[in-house]
Amino acid sequence: NGDVRISYAVSDTTSPYYRNAIGDECVYVESGSAVVETVFGALPVRQGDFVMLPRTTIHRWVPQDVDGSGPLRTYAIEANSHIAPPKRYLSRFGQLLEHSPYCERDLHGPTKPLLAEGSDVEVLTKHRGNGPSGIVGSTVVHTTHPFDVVGWDGCLYPYTFNVSDFEPITGRVHQPPPAHQVFEGNNFVICAFVPRKVDYHPLAIPVPYYHSNVDSDEVMFYVD
C-alpha cells in the first residue's frame, strides 16, 4: 500500500551497494548470518535479528555461511517514514522506560569503521520519481568509496535487535495486539508474538469474541 512495502529475499551472494532514499527499512533475519557493511561501519547480523537501516544509509549485505547455516533468508519491511520504538515505550527524553519489553542494551550498532578504498563505486538508489508507483531507481556513481570513513558522530545509525531479547507482556486474560509491538512506522506497526504464558486465569477465553481487527490489515510471518 502507500505506507509500507513487504518483500522476502534468499541469497548466498554479496548484494550490490544500495541506498533507500524513501524511508527506513526493517529487515528480519529468518535464518543464516551476514555482515551488513554500511557507511557507519560493519554490522554483524544473525538469525532472529531485526536489522534497522535508516533512510539513505548506503549499505550492502555480505552473507556468511557459518557452521552450515545455509543461505541468508530475510523478510524486509520498507517504510515511507521512520521506523522507531513505540512512543509509549519512551520517556520525553527518548529513553526506553522500565515497562518497555526491551532496553538500550538490547540494541547493537556497528562494530568498527570499514575504511574501504576504491573509485567509481556504483550505488543503486531507490527514490521518488515519475514511475507508475511514484518510486523509481537510479545508479549513482561515487568517485571515491562511500565507506572510506574514519568515524561519525550523532545518534542516528543502523542497529540490530534480536527477537530473543523481546520480553513478552502477559496477563491473566487476553492481551490486545499492541502488547506485542516492537516498532512502529507511519500507519503501521511491527509486532512479535513470541513464546509466552497466555491467558492463565481459569475462566480466560483464549481467543475472545471481541478480538476483531476490522480497521487494519494484518500480515503474519511464521518462523521457528
Give the predicted meaning of each segment.
Residues N1-D224:
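Jelly-roll (double-stranded beta-helix
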